[in-house]
Amino acid sequence: MTWAYFRPGGVIDAGARLNPDGTIAEWEFHNYNSGPSGLQTPYEVGSKKEHQHQSKSPLRQSSYRGLAATANHFARECYMDELAHSIQMDPLEFRLKNAKNERLRNVIQAAADKFGWKSRKKTLGRGFGISAGFEKGGYVAACAEISVTHGAVKVVRVVEAFECGAVVNPEHLANQVEGAVAMGLGGAMFEQIDFADNKIITNKLSHYRVPRFADMPVIESVLLDRKDIVSAGAGETPIVGIAPAVGNAIFDATGQRIRSLPMAPKGLPAGAGSSSSMANGG
């Protein structure tokens, strides 16, 4: 593990100005180091500035499933939630208001309908989150339900809708979506490399926390089949929805906005999330 390449770490800054009706008038998004994949917002905005800034890393960097789209979607979709809450608008309605692309709207609505978003019931220690996005020709939306007990976060249920054009092999596609959710859960909640005194101290696989059977939620996939659209890949895009959906659910349950990955490797930190910057740990 001390020799391996690392997913690029990065810092992401996001900013926006809203119109009185809740549409996005101005949008600004900067990714430092982790990459440009998934950088561009899929939402309709009045004007935008979106840039990826390269920087030198002390670590050897390489690819992660979905590349930087995992980090960019985490930052953007959590920030979309912040914007929705700032004007007291439901996060689903806020996304639909700003989503003009038919395919994006379809996956958002499909995930919300299957999840039962409008009939969700808020109880103590229970939270619900939603996210959406686009990458590599595919559109994805995820809804997550989590529970929090004494700082320990349990992802209870995930519904993910995915559309990548014409579906050729439905069973294999469902496996890709569900596998991406499982892998994305690890990056969202647990997986990290720790350093001390310029050395890697997570130097054994037994010290590297990955999702266990007990961590796995109920996963439901909704596959939208568009026979009128040429098939796109499905191996990477489904991973981008899980982290922001869980992050938004944690906020819904606790009022804590966590802005770095992984979010809760050892439970929720006290007073998490006080900055407007989003960071992705490799």
Regions found by a protein language model. Name each.
Residues M1-G282:
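Cofactor-binding beta-sheet edge motifs in enzyme active sites
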